[in-house]
C-alpha cells in the first residue's frame, strides 16, 4: 500500500508547472515522482526554478507516456493548448487521474473549439467526461473525476465575479463586460517582445481586446448557472504586477436593490466555500489581488452606482494560484477524496 | 514692453505644480516669476523638486494676492478643490489670466457642486464665464479666455475616449462605462496609507467605485457634444505605474459598423488636433499610456467585439501632462494667442 | 498540559508583526493568543492585514503587561527601538520567553548604545543574558534562551555574507564594505515622504550612508567569529522591490585563492544549516532576493575579480523573513526545542 | 548652404537609437535624414517607437555605406560591439563626423581589446584619432573631432563619481569599487530570459560580477586624470527601474578630511560643467537617478564614514541619456561648434 499518491507534472519548467511544484512539494498526501520538460530534460529542476533549490532534487525528464503509469498515479498537464488533448485518452486508459491546465477539455460544445481555438476537437466524447475544474461550481462532479479541465485565469476571475449575479438574475443578461487587469506572469515563462521588462513595466496595455478566448468558457459556465444564454465580453489589460488578476465585471441592474441585498445574494451563493472571501470593509473596501498573492483565495466584492443602476462586481485572484495551479490542486484534492485545502494552506504574503 | 508673459504658479510644491514648472521653465514666451507654497515658503524650489536643480533658482513664497499683479500677468492655481474659488474673483479683477487646475470652475450647473463636491458654489456667475479647458472641444472659446477651468485627468481620459462616439451617436447612450487605470502620481504628492510604497506597488485597486466625481464634468461635456443627456460611470483603478491613465470606455453599438467606419468617425472628429494621435497598428494596436509619458499627447484607439456589439474606445494620457499641467499650458497658450504647443514640444520617453 | 505554546505578538499591526502572524497562523506548535496594537486596539486584525481575512478572527488589543502571563507563554516584541527594553525585564520575571525584534538587546557592549542609538541602556546586565538570534552563529546558546535579540535585516544580510570570510581570514580585515540594496517594506508600515509611491518607485537611493547603525551588531558578530576587531561599513540603498535585501560585501583577498577553494570555505562554514543555500550555477550564478521571497532562506554566493584581488560575497534574504519575522521564529523554535523549521516550511514564490 | 546638419542614425530600432531620435527630433541644428535598421527596413520608424508617432514620418532603411555621404553629414552608430569598427574608416574617408556608441574606439591601447572584448582591433591607428566622448574630461579635444567614441553607461557613472577623487589623490589608489545599480533599459531592446518581465521585475541581481568590461575604459580615463595607474572594480546589479544608473564608488581616505573640503574638491573639479550637478542637501542628500530621468544631467554627491575613513562618491545618470544618447549628442554638439546643450535642454521628469 502506498502512503502517498505519486504525481507527475508534465511541462514543469513553465510558471504554472513551477507553481504546481511549489504547492506539491509540501502537500501532505502527494509525492512528486516525475517532472518533465522537453527543453530542460536531464537538468536539475532547481536550475530553472531557483526558488526550489534544496527542496526538489529531481531532474527534468522527457515525457514518456508509455512508462508514466509505472511512476505516477495522477498527472498534471501544464502544456500549451492543442497538446494535452493528444495525451489525455491514453493517460485515462492507463488509469491515471488527469488534471489538464490547458483549454483542451474546458468546453462542452466541440463546435466552439473551431470558433475560438481554430482546431477540430479529436475527442468530443471526452468533453462530456471532463469536469470543469472550478470547485465552487462543480464540487460534486469533481468527486472521483478522472479528467479535470482546469479553468483559465481570466475565465476564473470573470466567472467568480459574475456567477452570483447571473444566478440571481438581477441584471441585464446581455451586457456583461469583464474588464480584467492582469500581471505579467499570466503570459508564461517564455520571453517575447511584449514581455521584455522595459516594454512591460509601466504598461497599461489592452490585449486580445476584440474577443478574448476565455469568454467561451465563461459564457458556458455562466449560462449553465443562469439557465439562460449569457453573453460576456472579456477585455484584458496587462498592468505592471507580476502576479494577480482583477476582474471588474460591469453590469446594469434591472431593479433597484440595496447594497445589503446584493451582499446577501453574493454571500449566500458562496456560503461555505473554502477559498472565497467576501469583501466589504472600510479600509480596503474592494478586492485587490495584492491581498491574495501566493494563496488560493478569491476575494469577491462589489460597488453600485445607484443613480445609473450600474453594478460592478470585482474578483481578485493570484493568476498562478486560483487562476491556475492552486485551483488545479484544489480540484485534484476533491477528486482524490483529500481535504480540499491539502497543500493549499498557503497564507497570502503582505506586503507583496 | 515686456518680452515674456510673467506667470505665477500657486501651489508649486505638489506634482501638478512641479509639472507646470517643468513645462514653463523651457516655455519660449513665459517667465516664471512667482512660485508659492504655504508649506515650503522661503525654501528653494529645487529642494522639493530635485529634478529642477540648476534650472530654477527661485524660492517658494507665500501667496500674497494683493501684490500678485505687480509680479505676474497670468496665474496657474494648482490648489485643492474649494480653495481656488476664493481667489479667482479678485485675480480676475486684477486683470490676470487665471488657469485653475481644481474642479472649482469646471461645472456649469451650480447645483452639481452640492451633489458631487458637497459645497454651495459662491460664484455661480463665474461658472458661465469660465471655459472648460479641453482645447479639443473648446478651442474657439479659449481664445482670450480669462478664466480657464482645467479638466480632471480621469475626466479628460474619459471624454477624449467617448467624444467621437457620442458625437456620432453609434451606441447606446445610457450605458457608458469608463473603466480607468491610473498611476500613483494622480493622487498627488501628499503621503497616505494607500500611497505607501509597499501598499501601492502591485496594487490593482478599485477606488471611488460607487460614483467618481469626474463623471459630473464628463457627462456635462459629452451631453453638450451629443446634444442629449449622456450618462457615464467612471470606475477608476489604481495600478502600479507612477504616470499614466488609460480609459477603457465600454459601450454597446446600436448598429453594425465596420471597423474602418468607426476609425473614420474618430479620425474625422479629431482631424487637425495637435495632441491627438489615432492608434491603429499591428505591433501596438491599442493606446498605452507608456507611449505618451512626459508629453501632452492623448492616444486614442478602439476595439470591437462584433458577435456581441461591444465597442471599447481607449484613451491613453500622461495624467500629469494631458491630464493636468500640460493641458493647462495648452489652454493657456490658446488664450494668450501663442502657438498651441509652445513649451509642449516634449517628446514622450521610451522606454519609461 | 497544554497542547500548544500560546504566543503573543506585541506591535501586531506593522509589517514585522503581520509577518509573524502569517507564519504563526500555520505553525504546528503555537497558538496565537494575543495581538496588540495601540493604534488599532478593538479592531479586527484582518482589517489591517487583509491577507489574513478568514484566517485570524482576533481583534487587536492594548498591551497589558500585567495580564500577559495569563494569556501567553512566549511573546514577540515587534516594537520600535527604545520601547522593548522597558518591557523585557518584567516579561522575563513573569516567566515568558521573550523574542525582541528591536535593537534593544542586540549589542553586548552598553557603550555602543550611546554611540549608535543615542540612549543609555538601562539594563546592561540583560545584554549579557540576551542571545543574538542568528541561529547559524548561536544555535547552542539559543537552546532554552529566555531573551532572544533578533538581528536587524541589513545586519543579517551583511553578517551572513561575511561570516565565512572573516572566519577563514582570507581578506583584508579593515576594509569591508557591505553595499546593501533593500526593498521598501524594510522601512515599516508607516507612510512617509520617502515611502510615498511616486517617490519610492524607481528610486535607487542611498540612505544612512554615513554610518548605518546595523554596522554595530555586524562588527560585534564578525569580530567574535574572527577573534579580531573587524570593521565594516554598511551602505544601504533603497531600490524598487517591496521585499528583499541583497548585501554585496566587497573585500580584498590577501592571498590568491582559486574559486573552488573559496566555495569550499563558505560551504564548510554553513554545512548543515537548514536555511542557508550556497549558490553557484550557470543560469543564476549569484544570489538574488527574488528567489527567496516569502521564505526564510538566505542564499549565499560570491564573485572574484582575480586581476585586482577583489572578492565580493553576496547574501540574499527576504527582509521580513530571514531579515525579521522568519528568523525570529527560527530562533524561537530552537529555544523551545521545536524543529528549527516549524512554521517555516514556506517555499519561496516564483515569479514574485 | 545648408541650414541644418543632416544626421543619420544607424541602428535606429534599439533603445539607444530611439533615444537619439527623441533628442534629435527637436534639435535646433540637425535634420534626421536617415534611420537604418536591418530588421525593420521598410517599416515606419513610429511602428517600433510608438512614442514618436506623429513626430517622425521616415521609414527605416537598410544601411548603405556607399550612398550615405549623399544623405548625411554626420552619423551616429548605435551598433553592437565589433560592428562599428568595420564602418568607421570608410565613413571618415567620406568626410562624415562619426559618433560611435559602441566600445570599438574607446580604448587607446589595442591590447586591451583582446583582453576585454576578445578581438584583435583591426584599426589601431584610429584608436589614437578617436576622442573619448566624455565632455567633462575631453572638451577641448572634442572640438572638431571627427571620430567620437561615446562612453559606456556604467563607465560614465563610475568615471564621473571617481574623477574628482583620483584627481585630488585623497584616497587609496588601488582599492576602488564601483557598485553600480542599473535599470533594465541598459540591456537593450532585445528580449532575453533575464529581461522577461516576471524575471526582471523585483530582481536585485548581480551580473558580470567577476570583471565588468567597462572597467577597462574607466581605468584608462581615471589613470589619465590621476597620472598614475588606477585600478577599479565595477560590480553591476540589475534593479527594477527601467531607466537610471547609480554608481556607489567606495574608496578609503588616506587622510582625514572634513566634508566641506571634499565638497570643495568635487565642486572645483566640475566647475562650469553644464550637465553636472553637485548634490548636498537635507531632504535628498545623495544623488538618485530618479531625479535625472529623461535628461542629460549627472548628479554627483558623496558620503563619508569618518570612524573608518570610508568615502563613497555617488553618481546618478539616466543610462540612455548621459549614459548613452544624450552624452553622444553633447559630444557631437561640441565637435560641430554648436551649443553644448542644443537638443539637450530636457528637464528631468518628476515623479517618474
Curated annotation (Swiss-Prot), chains A, B, C, D:
Keywords, alphabetical: Amino-acid biosynthesis, Arginine biosynthesis, Cytoplasm, Lysine biosynthesis, NADP, Oxidoreductase
Binding, NADP(+): 13-16, 319
Catalytic activity reported: [amino-group carrier protein]-C-terminal-N-(1-carboxy-5-oxopentan-1-yl)-L-glutamine + phosphate + NADP(+) = [amino-group carrier protein]-C-terminal-N-(1-carboxy-5-phosphooxy-5-oxopentan-1-yl)-L-glutamine + NADPH + H(+); [amino-group carrier protein]-C-terminal-gamma-(L-glutamyl-5-semialdehyde)-L-glutamate + phosphate + NADP(+) = [amino-group carrier protein]-C-terminal-gamma-(5-phospho-L-glutamyl)-L-glutamate + NADPH + H(+)
GO molecular function annotation: N-acetyl-gamma-aminoadipyl-phosphate reductase activity; N-acetyl-gamma-glutamyl-phosphate reductase activity; NAD binding; NADP+ binding
Entry EC number(s): 1.2.1.103, 1.2.1.106
One Pfam family per UniProt: Semialdhyde_dh
Location (main, coarse): cytoplasm
Signal peptide as annotated in the record: none
Gene symbol of the encoding locus: lysY
Protein name: [LysW]-L-2-aminoadipate/[LysW]-L-glutamate phosphate reductase
Cellular compartments annotated: Cytoplasm
Biological-process GO terms, alphabetical: arginine biosynthetic process via ornithine; L-arginine biosynthetic process; lysine biosynthetic process via aminoadipic acid
TM helices/strands, residue ranges: none
Residues at the catalytic site: 153
Organism: Saccharolobus solfataricus (strain ATCC 35092 / DSM 1617 / JCM 11322 / P2)
Amino acid at each position: 500500500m502506498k502512503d502517498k499518491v505519486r504525481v507527475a507534472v508534465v511541462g514543469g519548467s513553465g510558471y504554472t508547472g513551477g507553481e504546481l511544484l511549489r504547492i506539491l512539494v509540501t502537500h501532505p498526501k502527494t509525492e512528486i515522482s516525475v517532472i518533465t520538460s522537453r527543453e530542460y530534460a536531464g537538468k536539475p529542476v532547481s536550475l530553472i526554478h531557483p526558488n526550489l533549490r534544496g527542496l526538489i532534487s529531481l531532474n527534468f525528464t522527457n515525457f514518456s507516456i508509455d512508462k508514466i503509469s509505472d511512476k505516477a498515479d495522477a498527472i498534471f498537464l501544464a502544456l500549451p493548448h492543442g497538446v494535452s488533448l493528444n495525451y489525455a485518452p491514453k493517460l485515462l486508459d492507463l488509469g491515471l487521474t488527469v488534471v489538464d491546465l490547458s483549454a483542451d477539455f474546458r468546453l462542452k460544445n466541440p463546435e466552439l473549439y473551431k470558433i475560438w481555438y481554430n482546431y477540430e476537437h479529436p475527442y468530443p466524447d471526452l468533453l462530456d467526461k471532463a469536469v470543469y475544474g472550478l470547485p465552487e461550481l462543480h464540487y460534486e462532479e469533481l468527486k472521483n473525476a478522472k479528467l479535470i479541465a482546469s479553468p483559465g485565469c481570466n475565465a476564473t476571475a470573470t466567472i467568480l465575479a459574475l456567477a452570483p449575479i447571473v444566478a440571481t438574475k438581477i441584471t441585464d443578461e446581455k451586457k456583461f463586460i469583464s474588464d480584467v487587469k492582469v500581471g505579467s506572469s499570466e503570459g508564461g515563462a517564455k520571453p517575447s517582445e511584449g514581455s521584455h521588462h522595459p516594454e512591460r513595466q509601466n504598461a497599461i496595455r489592452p490585449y486580445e481586446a476584440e474577443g478574448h478566448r476565455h469568454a467561451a468558457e465563461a459564457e458556458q459556465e455562466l449560462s449553465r448557472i443562469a439557465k439562460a444564454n449569457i453573453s460576456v465580453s472579456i477585455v484584458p489589460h496587462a498592468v505592471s504586477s507580476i502576479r494577480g488578476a482583477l476582474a471588474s465585471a460591469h453590469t446594469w441592474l434591472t431593479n433597484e436593490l440595496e447594497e445589503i441585498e446584493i451582499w446577501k445574494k453574493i454571500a449566500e451563493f458562496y456560503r461555505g466555500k473554502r477559498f472565497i472571501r467576501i469583501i466589504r470593509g472600510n479600509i480596503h473596501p474592494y478586492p485587490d489581488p495584492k491581498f491574495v498573492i501566493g494563496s488560493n483565495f478569491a476575494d469577491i466584492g462589489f460597488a453600485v452606482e445607484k443613480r445609473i443602476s450600474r453594478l460592478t462586481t470585482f474578483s481578485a485572484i493570484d493568476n498562478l494560484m486560483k487562476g491556475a495551479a492552486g485551483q488545479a490542486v484544489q480540484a485534484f484534492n476533491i477528486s482524490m477524496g483529500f481535504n480540499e485545502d491539502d497543500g493549499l494552506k498557503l497564507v497570502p504574503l503582505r506586503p507583496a
